[in-house]
Amino acid sequence: MEGNKKMNKTWNLKEMKKLIPLALPVLVVNLSIVGMGAVDAIVAGRAGVTDMAAVALGSSVYLPVALFACGVLMIIGPVIANMRGKSHESRVGYMTNHGLWLALMLSLVSMPVIYVLRNVFGWISDDAAMCRMASAYMFAIMWGLPANLGFVALKSLNEGSNMTRPAMYVGLCGLLLNIPLNYMFVFGMYGFPRMGGAGCGAATAVIFYIEFLLMFLLVYFNPKHRPYRRHIISWRRPTPSVITHLVRLGVPIGVSQLCEVMLFCAAALVLAPLGETQVASHQIAGNVGGLVFMLPLSVGLAASIRVAYHHGRNDLAGTRSAILSSYVLVLTICLCTFGGITLFREQIVHLYNDSELIVSTASVLLVLAAAYQLPDCLQVLSVGVLRGFRDTASITFITFFSYWMVGFPA
């Protein structure tokens, strides 16, 4: 009996050692994405209040469409991990190629949607200058969507192959390039025209293509991908049944992401009439909560890969070990973040604003945000585990019911 307990503990420790190195680079990638948004806000703010508001408004309309498309592609990683678990390595390149085709198809659908949505700003604001700038921002960033989705497809190949560091390196390069490119396009440096806030969209679009090119080169010249390299870059017509299979599994993930991001957009609109103090306090709490959320989100993605791999091998003990290790890691993260935010809530708010009214209001909201971390961490991890089992339909129903039938009315 003691020997079995020791064996289970050993297996859990081994699984934890595989889970953490898989999750850490994903965390860096997620933080680099958040960092790019912060750089956009800072540079646009230097250009003017109108530019900063236009970037915020444009991104709030662009992001739901982009996140839905990216969510559909997120299933590629678990599918590839499952294939590797079944020792179907020969089909990995074939599936990646279909992922790239799906990325192209999603781009052809999403870009016209973004183009049409550029015209909604006139309905929600009387500020003509801000609306024009927000529309120009969306038009600029729209052209980078195909590269962004292609990057996600190739990133999913690496994640499904237990290689998350390449995306980390590319994400950090994108973050570093975002600063000079923003200044070049926003302020019209080195011969480029001055675009104002719309320049943030142009800079992001350029970075998407750079990231896609870097990820493609890292995949193509990686010796581990050599056996199926020619399948990845094949221009052979995709098989409709494979595309349908990926869409059937991926669309529920995209819908669940859409439900979540749309709720937070709606919450911001509901808070607007309550005054700038409430809006600013909510923004601070949401920003801190969003940063902390990247921790369990990264573990959830790593868990989906490990669960899919063990499930593909029909390894029940390995699957159980991956799930248990993931929950232990996430619960540890929850306790640490709850304690840190609760103890240092006022110091955290002071990093954003020194107004006593905002400090007192936001400090209370931070305690609620810290308490919210526990169910939210468990939720995002459970979604990752279900994704590893390729059970995505239940994710959509649970997310829609929780966020819109319970959360929004409350």
Regions found by a protein language model. Give the residues of each.
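Short alpha-helical transmembrane segments in multi-pass integral membrane proteins
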Residues: 1-23, 80-146, 192-251, 307-372
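Membrane-interface helix-loop junctions in multi-pass transport and translocation proteins
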Residues: 165, 175-213, 360, 393, ...
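Transmembrane helical elements of multi-pass membrane transporters/channels
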Residues: 21-40, 140, 144, 174, ...
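Small-residue-rich hydrophobic transmembrane alpha-helices
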Residues: 52-111, 115, 148-167, 268, ...
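Small-residue hotspots at the loop-to-helix junctions and early N-terminal turns
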Residues: 49-60, 134, 138, 201, ...
